[in-house]
Amino acid sequence: MDLEAVVAQFRGKVRKHTLLPMKAIFPPELEDKLKLEFFSGSLSGYFVDIGANDPRDGSQTWPFEQLGWEGVLVEPQHDLAERLRQERRAKVYAVACSSPKNSGKSATLNLAGIHTSLDPDFFVAGMRPVGTSNVLLRTLDEILIDAKAPAPLDFVSIDVEGHELEVLEGFDLDRWRPSLIMIEDLAFNLSTHRYLTRRGYKWVRRTGINGWYVPAESPMTISPMGHLQFFRKHYLGVPFRILREKKRRLTAKWRQG
């Protein structure tokens, strides 16, 4: 498919699925459409994808690369990093992002497909551990400097299975000031939300399990319905979510014998 056809396809989807600005929480199948709408189908931009995983399937940045964007892909699983090098144009770093105090160290990566994590205690229902490997740790700042990334950035996706705060600690938000940060948040607590809001970002949307954050000065706003959705998700629903997850863990341990 040539570039003109790709642009027409995605812009058509954006127009077709433009949503009323009432809701703030949406199902995951609308994620790509809403991202493209956010950037108005722009043909140029710079993305950063931490925990890039598969080159295309479920990729947060593949649609942008199709439109002509440039960027950085960070993927600690060496087999996937090699596939990214073969199938994507963006710069690939086969490392894991962490905090400044961990930079330069080697860490154990607990392999479990899309749920691969640096945290040995990380668990979600359905994950299947398949072993471990060693990976080099670097801060996101170091990677961006090495890649000669522009500032401000346009889009940053963070999907690191429980290591989000450490990644953010190695990411100078004042320097890079991305227009949109999309970060996986299972909503068991407010630690990620508080970190970002204290550093000049505001929550504006959620798609699937990903929170959307934009600079506090952004004109994007949340409706009263959106605020209610946030309160229900991140406050009222937390105790029930924690209990449900504990039940899943116990069930998984019981099945493992």
Predicted regions and their residues:
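Phosphate/nucleotide-binding beta-alpha loop and adjacent structural elements of enzyme active sites
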Residues: M1-G257
